[in-house]
């Protein structure tokens, strides 16, 4: 994961405030320098540094330079926001979990393909889950946060019995990843260690977010 210095981070925040997370914004180095109180040359170096760190992308058109905050840039800003939230003790508390994508054993795909569970999750979470789960290995600090989340109000997904076997209940809590509605699911019986969470969504998250093994993700609850 690329890291950036404080000056580059300030530049990234300014681009985001100008709308760079929503789409490409026309931005000259002179205008950026004026807003940040730095020279045009320094502003140009800041943009080059952010582009090298893959926090932004730039395109040159006849009407000027357009700058877009990339997904990596958004995730950096989300982590920064989470730090400020801790400092100022934001109420209606948001819990932020950070971790990396890992492969599962296919258990989630099996359960998310069962019509009963699909219907329950659609009713309780507001989306029909993609048949599969995104497995995330939490970093050590997020493991502690995840434990604190057990005191929150989780939604119970009832179990059921068919002619062959009994399917146990599960619990879930709504969350988002890069703005996409999701839910953390905890089966009644789970084989995962405490540092692993399973996330469901109405979309294939790996494809939608271009995630690969060990990609870093930020999960926001609340």
Swiss-Prot record:
This is Riboflavin kinase. FMN binds at residues 190, 198. It comes from the Archaea. InterPro entries: ArsR-like_HTH, RibK_CTP-dep, Riboflavin_kinase_archaeal, Riboflavin_kinase_CTP-dep, Riboflavin_kinase_dom_sf, WH-like_DNA-bd_sf, WH_DNA-bd_sf. Residues 95-222 are annotated as: Riboflavin kinase. Binds 1 Mg(2+) ion per subunit. Pathway: Cofactor biosynthesis; FMN biosynthesis; FMN from riboflavin (CTP route): step 1/1. Catalyzes the CTP-dependent phosphorylation of riboflavin (vitamin B2) to form flavin mononucleotide (FMN). One of its GO terms (biological process) is riboflavin biosynthetic process. CDP binds at residues 104-109, 203-206. Signal peptide: none annotated. The keyword Flavoprotein applies. Keywords: Flavoprotein, FMN, Kinase, Magnesium, Metal-binding, Nucleotide-binding, Transferase. It comes from Methanocorpusculum labreanum (strain ATCC 43576 / DSM 4855 / Z). Residues 1-94 are annotated as: H-T-H motif-like. Mg(2+) binds at residues 133, 135. Belongs to the archaeal riboflavin kinase family. GO terms for molecular function: magnesium ion binding; nucleotide binding; riboflavin kinase activity.
């Amino acid at each position: 994961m690329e890291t950036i210095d404080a000056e580059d981070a300030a530049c990234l925040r300014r681009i985001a405030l100008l709308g760079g997370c929503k789409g490409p914004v026309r931005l000259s180095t002179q205008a950026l320098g004026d807003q940040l109180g730095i020279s045009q040359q320094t502003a140009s170096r800041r943009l080059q540094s952010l582009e090298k760190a893959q926090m932004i992308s730039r395109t040159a058109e006849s009407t000027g330079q357009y700058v877009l905050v990339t997904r990596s840039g958004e995730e950096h800003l989300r982590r920064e926001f989470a730090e400020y939230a801790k400092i100022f003790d934001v109420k209606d508390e948001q819990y932020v979990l950070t971790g990396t994508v890992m492969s599962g054993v296919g258990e989630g795909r099996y359960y998310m393909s069962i019509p009963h569970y699909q219907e329950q999750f659609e009713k309780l979470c507001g989306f029909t889950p993609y048949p599969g789960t995104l497995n995330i290995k939490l970093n050590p600090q997020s493991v502690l946060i995840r434990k604190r989340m057990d005191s929150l109000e989780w939604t119970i997904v009832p179990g059921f019995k068919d002619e062959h076997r009994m399917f146990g209940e599960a619990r879930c809590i709504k969350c988002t990843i890069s703005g996409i509605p999701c839910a953390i699911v905890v089966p009644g019986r789970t084989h995962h260690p405490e540092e692993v969470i399973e996330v469901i969504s109405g979309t294939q998250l790996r494809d939608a977010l271009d995630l690969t093994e060990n990609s870093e993700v930020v999960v926001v609850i609340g």
